[in-house]
Amino acid sequence: REDNLKRLGLAAERLACDATTLETEPFDAILLDAPCSATGTLRRHPDVAWIKQESDVFKLAQLQSRLLDQSIRLLKPEGRLVYCTCSLEPEEGEMQIENALKRHPALRRDPIRREEMGGLSAALTPLGEARILPFMAFEGESALSGVDGFFIARLGLRK
């Protein structure tokens, strides 16, 4: 949102469109907050467990794969891509990244560093991705404060 960009002193061009068919000049960086099953929001939205089906995860994973492929095509050489979902499902997180790395030889992980985790360093995986679980709490806070579940990976293109 514009107010968040302003508050953080950042400038960005935001696009809201069908990214699977977007034709444009390449970008330096892309944030792909992919549509997902929202299983990471169960703490706040317990109905997700009853309204989402396994077939929903499968369909969403297919869409995420297409969005990832298109986002990678739209990156400049040495560009960066942050992929995230509010899903707890590996098919929508870790497996998406593994498969994208296999499909795109120029793609590489750009590991998230501990100091970038803002009090949730326990969520950092050995591969430098973030797997935030609803029972986690920011360092120094009670686990009762709760967070939504997320998966976050940062990727880059080699020259």
Q: Would you name each region that the model predicts?
A:
Residues R1-K159:
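S-adenosylmethionine
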